[in-house]
Amino acid sequence: MLMTRKKPVQWTRLDNAAKIFPPNTNEKDTKVFRFVCELKEEVDREILQEAVNKTIILFPVYRSVLRKGVFWYYFESTELMPEVVEEYKPPCSMLYHPNRRNLLFEVTYYRKRINLEMYHALADGTGALGFFKTLLYFYITSKYKEDFKEQLPNLDYDASFAQKMDDSFLKHYTGEKCLNKVKVTRAYRIAGRRSIDNRLKVIEGVMDVKEILALAHRYNTTLTVYLTALFMKAIYQEMPARAKKYPVVLSVPVNLRIYFPSVTARNFFGTINISYDFTKNKDDLDSIIKGVKEEFARELTEEKLRKHMNRLSALEHNAFMRIVPLFIKDWVLRFANRINDKGITATLSNIGKITVAKELAPYITLFNCFNSARRPQIGMCSFGDQLVISFASPFDGTDIQKNFFRMLSQEGVAITITSSSREVG
C-alpha cells in the first residue's frame, strides 16, 4: 500500500499590524475586506477554480489557519484548499472563527464579478491585491487562451516566496525610543441603527476619475485630500448641534511600502489621523480642504511613519510582554482598541490606481474595494478612466452617503450608484 507523505507543518508569527485583529474580531466588526473585479463577461466557475489553485501555490502564506499559542497567535500551514463558490452570504462576513481551522480568505463570484475576501490579520490591501491580480491573470489567460496563444503577458507581481513572506515591520524596526505619549482626543462618533444581523450596507458610486482630478486641481490639491474634505463636510452636515464641539477625525491607512522597501504579501501599513475642528474653523469646503491639506502634510512624512511603526513594534520587543500570557495580551489589545476608537469618526482608504498588464485590461470593466465597518467607511480605487467610491456602513441610515454623492453631483460629476440590496445568505 502506497503512503503519501504529508508536508511538514510550518508556523509563522503574525506581523506587528496583524496582532490587533484576532482579539478585536466579532460579528459587528469582522476585520474582513473585499476586492471586487467586474469582468466584461459572466464568470466561469471551473476556470476560476483552476486559477485559484494556481495562485495559491505562489502565495503559500495564505494557505494557513490561525492558531492560539500560550503567548502569541500564529499561522499554521494547512492542506486545506480554497473552494470557489457563488456568492452566498453578505459582504465581509466572518472569516476567522477562534474554534475552527479554516482558511482566512475566500473567492466567490456573482454574474460578472469575482470577489476576494480576506481576513486582515493575513494581509493588507496591497498584499491581497497582488494575490488578486495574479488570480485574474491566470483566469483571463486561461478563459481566453486563444487570444494569448502567441505570447502570454507578463505577470506584474513576481516577488520571490521569501519576499512575499517577509515581516517588513520586523525588518524595518530600528528600536528607536519614542518617549512622547500619544494623546487620544475624543472625536465625534457617528451613531445609527444597526441591522438585526449586522449586515453591512454597501453603496457604490462609479464616476470618471478625470472629472474628480479636475475638481481636485481646481482647489489646488490632490484627489485624496479633496475627497477626504468632502467626506468631512458630508459628516458635519449630519452632526447634532450638541456634538459639534468634537472634531471630525478620519483614520487614513498608509501603504508603508511607498516609504520603506518591501514587496511583502502580508501586512505592511500604518494609519494617520486627519482631524478638523469645526468649532475653530469655517465649514465651507475651501477652508476644510486647506485644513485637511495641512494635516496630510504634517502627518504623512517618513519620520512620523517610522516613529509610529517603532512605537507599535516596541510592544512585541518588550522582554516583559513576551512572557505575558496571551489572554492578558488580548485584554490589553482590546482595551487599546477601545481607547483608539474614541478618537476616530470614520475611515477613508484609497487603494489608488490599479493596473494590470495591458493585454488583460480589455477583459475588465472595473475594480472595487471596501472593509467591514464599525462606523461608516470609504474605500476607493481607480482602474482605467473609472473611479469607484464605496461606502460601507453598519447602519441603516444613508444620509452621509447621500450628502457626499450629492455634493459631487452638484459639481457636475456624473455618478452611477448601486447598493448591496441583493439578498444573499
What is each of the regions a protein language model found here?
Residues M1-F71, E79-E106, Q237-G425:
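Acyl-thioester-dependent acyl-group transfer interface
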Residues M1-N16, L122-G130, T134-A214, L408-G425:
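Non-catalytic, low-complexity flexible loops and terminal extensions
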Residues R34, E117, R193-S195:
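A short, mixed-charge helix-start or loop-turn motif at secondary-structure junctions
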Residues K40-I56, E117-K133, E204-P240, I389-F391, ...:
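Acyl activation and transfer enzymes in specialized metabolism, enriched
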Residues F59-G69, Y144-F169, L215-L230, D330-A346:
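Short, charge-rich amphipathic segments
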Residues P98-T141, Q151, L155-K164, S382-T398:
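Histidine-centered acyl-transfer/condensation active-site motif
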Residues L135, Y139-K143, I235, F296, ...:
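Short, well-ordered alpha-helical segments in soluble proteins
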